[in-house]
């Protein structure tokens, strides 16, 4: 699903209920108020390369700007050119409004320091791809707590389904052993936690049997990327995460709708130059 990730402390300070904000137009007065009252928050809303305003639109990329909208009642499951849709035009107009009113960084489309701006306290919120506990996971990178609010329905798109897949290289000299390792990574909790969090006492400390705390100066570089490795249902919870996270994730996945193109992967070999 998609929605807002935002600074929990700022929302509480100004009594902002992000659950009541479902559109960019509803968000705009909040951004202006924060810009006026929080001098350090130069960019009340921000985004990285995959979290631009059109991320709230209900579509899935097929190839380049060729997309299929989830709203099949309106688009009938046809492939359309994203940049020719009225929804895309509205997203561009809204981004332009933010730019003209000084609510986003002037070089937002080329800037690469999105996380650093958030870490420096210059940003209140951004569009994000959400799941239960996502904000808590992301908060581990910062000195403040993030919260989240869902805007869209839950969709099981192809990108989410293949984004963390692991495969055996066709050039592997020992494919059977690689496959055995991948099987263990997805079934053995000890191995999964070793790969994802490192060594107990060195890279993390146990609080209880299934919860750990990670020091700020950890040298283990997978912090924040555990969702990519193995089976997330086997992993420890980190301090502050809900003990119900695993069950919430399973319920979240079960509720997800599948778009009309689910399981389809476009082979662009014949039109690679055109795309």
For each feature predicted by the language model, list its residue ranges.
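Extracytoplasmic/secretory soluble proteins
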Residues: 1-275
């Amino acid at each position: 699903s998609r929605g807002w990730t935002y600074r929990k402390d700022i929302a509480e300070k100004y009594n902002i209920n992000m659950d009541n904000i479902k559109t960019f137009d509803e968000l705009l007065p909040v951004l202006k108020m924060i810009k006026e009252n929080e001098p350090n928050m130069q960019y009340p809303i921000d985004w990285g390369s995959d979290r631009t305003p059109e991320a709230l639109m209900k579509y899935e990329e097929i190839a380049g700007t060729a997309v299929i909208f989830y709203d099949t009642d309106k688009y009938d499951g046809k492939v359309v050119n994203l940049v020719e849709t009225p929804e895309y035009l509205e997203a561009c107009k809204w981004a332009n409004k933010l730019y003209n009113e000084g609510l986003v960084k002037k070089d937002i489309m080329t800037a690469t320091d999105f996380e650093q701006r958030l870490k420096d306290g210059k940003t209140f919120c951004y569009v994000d791809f959400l799941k239960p506990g996502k904000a808590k996971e992301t908060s581990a990178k910062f000195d403040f707590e993030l919260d989240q609010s869902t805007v869209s329905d839950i969709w099981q798109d192809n990108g989410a389904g293949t984004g963390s897949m692991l495969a055996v290289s066709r050039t592997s000299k020992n494919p059977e052993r690689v496959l055995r390792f991948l099987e263990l990574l997805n079934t053995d909790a000890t191995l999964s936690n070793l790969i994802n969090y490192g060594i107990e006492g060195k890279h993390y400390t146990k609080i209880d049997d299934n919860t750990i705390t990670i020091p700020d100066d950890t040298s283990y570089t997978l912090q924040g990327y555990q969702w990519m490795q193995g089976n997330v249902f086997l992993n420890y919870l980190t301090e502050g995460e809900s003990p119900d996270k695993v069950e919430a994730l399973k319920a979240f996945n079960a509720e997800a709708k599948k778009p009309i193109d689910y399981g389809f992967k476009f082979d662009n070999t014949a039109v690679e130059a055109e795309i």
